[in-house]
Regions:
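Short, glycine-/small-residue-rich phosphate/pyrophosphate-handling segment
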Residues: 151-164
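Conserved N-terminal glycine/acidic-rich loop preference
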Residues: 186-188, 192-195, 224
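Extended, subdomain-level signal for the structured scaffold at the beginning of enzyme domains
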Residues: 1-134, 142-146, 163-168, 174-177, ...
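Alpha-helix boundary/capping and short turn/kink residues
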Residues: 155, 192, 205-209
Length: 228
């Protein structure tokens, strides 16, 4: 079900889900890879990063660390420091060639993949084939589109780039006025803060509504658009 209300010229809506639960391992970490490059939009990756980093699953292990199920790392074309929006400098953890397998892949808006688009596409195709879920935030959907990962699927992106996306990727079923769109293995969110909603949905799919709600509460995040 989609609910919305007018906010100026922009519709604020909940998400659309065509996806079921994800199976979490009984023990061990769920690796989460964040694909970043120059001009990566900070909130697009920092929002989901804080969500996954803040998940606590009571009774999952004997120690506090064991109850924190996600292990996070960044992947980039090289290990040279990148400059994200606002001048934030980040030293990537891995290159495409050296990155370990990930069960969750997060692709934020960014502007530094132009010269590395073939490498990024190759890595995304290989990594997403092994992952449980690949998610984009904002115009990160264009990266998934270029890789062919959205062909024949429903998707969304940043509201100011919807028309451009529709022209570039006519094979994708574009949805407007929604916070996110979930398919079984590929999901996309609208811009900026919508990535937090989609990340919470990933938590919900792995560990259920109670854990996801507790995560949102601990973040003091009052948005409810992730609940579908």
């Amino acid at each position: 079900m989609i609910t919305s209300m007018a906010l100026g010229a922009v519709a604020v809506a909940s998400g659309v889900s065509h996806a079921g639960p994800l199976r979490a391992p009984a023990t061990g970490k769920i690796p989460v890879a964040f694909l970043i490059s120059e001009n990566a939009q900070v909130i697009d990756f920092a929002g989901p990063w804080e969500v996954f980093d803040g998940v606590h699953v009571p009774g999952r292990g004997a120690t506090h660390d064991a109850s924190m199920p996600f292990e996070l790392f960044t992947v980039a074309p090289s290990k040279d420091p990148i400059r994200a929006t606002g001048g934030l400098h980040i030293v990537p953890d891995y290159t495409f060639a050296a990155a370990p397998p990930a069960k969750v892949i997060v692709v934020p808006a960014q502007g530094g993949l132009g010269a590395h688009v073939s490498e990024a596409k190759k890595w995304l195709l290989e990594a997403s084939a092994q992952s449980d879920i690949t998610m984009s935030v904002c115009t990160g959907a264009f990266v998934l589109g270029y890789a062919g990962l959205l062909d024949g699927l429903s998707a969304t992106t940043y509201f100011r780039r919807l028309d451009q996306f529709a022209k570039q990727f006519p094979q994708v079923k574009l949805m407007r006025g929604v916070r996110f769109v979930e398919n079984e293995k590929i999901s996309t969110s609208a811009g900026l803060s919508a990535g937090i909603d989609l990340a919470l949905r990933v938590v919900d799919r792995y560990f259920g509504r109670e854990v996801a709600t507790d995560t949102a509460t601990n973040l003091e995040y009052e948005g409810k658009s992730w609940i579908v």
